[in-house]
Amino acid sequence: MALSCVFFHAHPDDEALLTAGTMARLAAEGHRVVLVVATVGEQGLTAGPVDAGRLGEVRRAEVLASARALGCARVEFLGYGDSGLDGRAVADGGLVPFAGVDPEVAAGALADLLREEDAALLTTYDPAGGYGHPDHVQVHRVGARAAELAGTPLVLQATVDRDLLLRALRLLRLVYPLPIDRGAFDNAYTPRLAITHRIDVRPHLAAKRRSMSAHATQTTGGESVRTLAALLRLPGFLFRRVLGTEWFVQPDLPVGRVIRDPLATLRRNQG
């Protein structure tokens, strides 16, 4: 039976890095995949021909292209402003910064969409927002409350295997001058033993690469190589190794046995 699966993200390109393979997999299986983005990421870094004042407009177009590459049936924007890395950014055009909005208000809007879609699955982030970005933390708060309001049966927190991330950063920094303090990620995302879902997305890496490539503005800017650009430059075998798995935590599930199917809980309950 085809199900409606809603993926909730903070900014354009978050979907490409965290859940693109799972989205492509579910779409290929015939499920309805919906992408919800809280902001258009207008505070992000960029360089080249894009004027900073138009960055949000361009990134909106980029995430729509990414969604097409993944087979999404619908893309919705909650319409909040990008709060910036420190949560203090002044949103453009009078928008309310997402990190500062009342979570109950934003959750109500998302819950309306979940009900409209009769969503079986909602993905959010872990309580720390992965690496602590204020908008990512807010995605967790808003997503958890929206699922509660709408009665969405399955909530998965998109995350990264912290142990693999630290090894990958060591490897990437041998090749690229990444602007990343490895120590900043010592407590980021989720330790391997706390992860409940490990999803093999290698059959869908072509779609994931197209999704990542759609976010051209996020491959430039800053003083050194951007993370997205570095990942896209990886040779095929390393791309498969680094990006061939996606990880989730199901908060109400005891850790232990690793689940390989994002919809396993729903299938078990239906069976």
Task: For the regions a language model picked out, list residue spans one by one.
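Active-site rim/loop-helix segments in enzyme catalytic domains that contact anionic ligands
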Residues: 1-118, 145, 249-252
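Metal-dependent de-N-acetylase/amidase catalytic core
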Residues: 2-6, 90-91, 95, 100-271
